[in-house]
From Swiss-Prot:
Topological relation to the membrane, as annotated: Peripheral membrane protein
Lineage of the organism: Bacteria, Pseudomonadati, Pseudomonadota, Gammaproteobacteria, Alteromonadales
Job of this protein: F(1)F(0) ATP synthase produces ATP from ADP in the presence of a proton or sodium gradient. F-type ATPases consist of two structural domains, F(1) containing the extramembraneous catalytic core and F(0) containing the membrane proton channel, linked together by a central stalk and a peripheral stalk. During catalysis, ATP synthesis in the catalytic domain of F(1) is coupled via a rotary mechanism of the central stalk subunits to proton translocation. This protein is part of the stalk that links CF(0) to CF(1). It either transmits conformational changes from CF(0) to CF(1) or is implicated in proton conduction.
A Pfam family recorded for this sequence: OSCP
Keywords: ATP synthesis, Cell inner membrane, Cell membrane, CF(1), Hydrogen ion transport, Ion transport, Membrane, Transport
Name the UniProt record assigns to this protein: ATP synthase subunit delta
Keyword Hydrolase attached: no
Main location: membrane
Similarity remark: Belongs to the ATPase delta chain family.
Organism: Shewanella loihica (strain ATCC BAA-1088 / PV-4)
């Protein structure tokens, strides 16, 4: 994945800078999301690495996307096809999404808990993270009963493991060392 990110980063950055300049971040996010889905389609995948020329591949890809992609988006597709990089479109979309969140001072946080969190608990976690990260936080909550109790919060590079299973694992490691 690191290699895909390295390849995708210049395309994502160029698309993001252009979207900022044209005040079209949301529409570009939608376009890239759609293009990424097309590139991951089981019918499309073999064509991306097939025997088509770059211009044929770009034309086919643009035709499949139809009106979902504007002229500038089509230009990005053509450049990526010329460089044989259409298969990294999902990574381009992910990086674009990260750039967009960074620009908007937002972060997505994953909260895994042993039991379902109440709205009040989610609000408390969100407020604490917003204070700590100085960003607006969007929570993605899920339940994993194997945690026994507590939560694991992941926001970017930050990981807070407040689960009983995590504490037991850390205690076990200390006892073994």
């Amino acid at each position: 994945m690191a290699e895909l990110s390295t390849i995708a980063r210049p395309y994502a950055k160029a698309a993001f800078d252009f979207a900022i300049e044209k005040n079209a971040v949301e529409s570009w996010a939608e376009m890239l999301s759609f293009a990424a889905q097309v590139s991951e389609n089981e019918t499309m995948k073999p064509l991306l690495s097939g025997a088509l020329s770059s211009s044929q591949l770009a034309d086919l890809f643009i035709k499949v996307c139809g009106e979902q992609i504007n002229e500038q988006g089509q230009n990005l597709i053509k450049v990526m096809a010329e460089n044989g990089r259409l298969e990294v479109l999902p990574a381009v979309y992910e990086l674009f999404h990260e750039f967009s969140n960074e620009w908007a001072k937002e972060v997505e946080a994953s909260v895994v808990s042993a039991t379902e969190l109440s709205a009040e608990q989610q609000q408390q976690i969100s407020a604490s993270l917003e204070k700590r990260l100085t960003r607006k936080v969007k929570l993605n909550c899920s339940v994993d009963a194997s945690l026994v109790a507590g939560v694991i919060i992941t926001a970017g590079d930050l990981v807070i493991d407040g689960s009983v299973s995590g504490k037991l694992n850390r205690l076990s490691e200390k006892l073994q060392s």
